[in-house]
Amino acid sequence: LLNYVAAAALMPYAPFLTAAQETGYDVDVLAARFGASWEQVAHRLTTLARPSARGVPFFMIRVDAAGNVSKRFASGAFPFARMGGTCPRWNLHEALARPGQTLTQVIELPGGARWFSIARAVRRFAVPWGEPEPMFAVGLGCELKHAGALVYGRGAKDMTPVG
């Protein structure tokens, strides 16, 4: 709850939703505009679910290099297992090998559901001197039908079966 309140203070709902829609949900632009990290913006995007002012219903997941899930949020459906790891064909895992790049992917699950995914490697803001600097991959996604609203999803077609 404390994290939600902090995010709401840093990225107030109405201005953030308007900016998200105007930028095509461009996470880097939103991070710069609101003075937040890529991960904070991705998390905030999952909270834009007010009945009178909804954003794209995103899910967000954060994994480490071993595939351990350390964060999982969704404003709508969440297409992946609640327990255990994630499919290695999902480019979420590739993001760790390509820091600084935002990767996109259209994925198709075994049941035929199609999703659009954005993945990026992120680091912690502050790490004590001498400590290892952990890197995580953050995945942000939505049902494929919403991909046209995203700057990343315009023209996305090629599918990768995952699951």
Label the model's feature ranges.
Residues L1-G163:
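Conserved binding/catalytic microenvironments
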